[in-house]
């Protein structure tokens, strides 16, 4: 007689959203498969689902399941193989005066002021530009799954950029970044990813999960600059050109 072992935790429930206009490709329809992070196993669940293409927002893990479309391709950087190109090395030289550190994720007014300035300059027509300090705190605090904040500060101690990151069992997931919009020469969005890659290299963590690469979307296409880049396709993770067919 076989014995079914007891469940160590409740089964994870998944749901599918209704159709919405795609925020990345004009004329497309977006639907998502999603689940909530609740309980004490958030870090483990986040790690497992990140490996199969899910992303986190607040206490929700989601991935696109859009009808007739597979444009959103999950991508990650294999840290040991990554080598910055000439443009990225120039960005690193420009930012030599910045220091970077990973700290426990805790919302502050200093962060919110920078976040609000970034939204106003870069995304002034988005819902995020209407976020209050309480909304920002919820973004940082809800669904914590071993979540940290990568800070970039100049020599005077001023916060120039920040990235909300989740520590996974095989690396880091870059959740959201924001930075000083009055410093375009620094290319701080790219620099924050480079700094996270270096933190992972020092810690021996193999991957940086960057979310979705979307060909034809200016907001998402930039991720292909980080080479080599792996993408999740039908047969698992593979170099982007092979997996994004």
Regions found by a protein language model. Give the residues of each.
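Terminal substrate-recognition subdomain of acyl/acetyltransferases
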Residues: 1-104, 201-202, 206-245
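Active-site catalytic microenvironments for nucleophilic, acid-base chemistry
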Residues: 121, 195, 199-203
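Conserved acetyl-CoA-binding loop-helix of GNAT-fold acetyltransferases
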Residues: 185-197
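Short, flexible segments with low predicted structural confidence
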Residues: 16-21, 172, 194-195
